[in-house]
Design a protein with these regions (language model features):
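Carboxylate-rich, polar loop motifs that coordinate divalent cations or form catalytic acidic clusters
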Residues: 1-133
Length: 133
């Protein structure tokens, strides 16, 4: 009987749990496209979305879309492909993603894109303090 009362009280308390917070983010809020291929949350709590129209980041209030550009040998900016299939990070201020089979790094501190590998990248992940390509 005592176990039944404790179970009843426990279930009653659980029924008053707080509702789950959910915010829909779409094109109206600034997302570049509705088809999201990958999602990553960085160490600052921002959400990164890889779409076929670029890299979008949600800071809790606004969505900003990046069309990644790299500087070549002559310091001229060239656009990286827009389709972002995989995103990951190392919790040290770097976001890694693949775009058109190349590996790109985005530094959160300098806000610059760096090309790490030009071709042959189909997926990217971070684990055991290593970047897996």
């Amino acid at each position: 009987m005592r176990k039944t009362i404790i179970l009843f009280i426990f279930l009653h308390v659980l029924s008053y749990a707080f509702p789950i917070y959910f915010k829909h983010i779409g094109m109206k809020e600034g997302l570049s496209q509705l088809s999201v291929m990958s999602i990553y949350q960085d160490e600052l709590g921002r959400m990164w979305f890889g779409t076929e129209e670029g890299l979008s980041v949600f800071d809790g209030v606004h969505v900003t879309t990046h069309k990644p550009t790299l500087k070549n040998e002559t310091n001229k900016e060239t656009t990286v492909g827009n389709s972002i299939d995989f995103i990951t990070g190392d919790n040290q201020g770097n976001i890694y993603f693949n775009s058109d089979n190349s590996l790109v790094q985005y530094n959160l501190h300098t806000q610059q894109f760096n090309s790490l590998k030009q071709s042959g990248v189909t997926a990217v992940a971070f684990g055991n303090d290593r970047l897996w390509v």
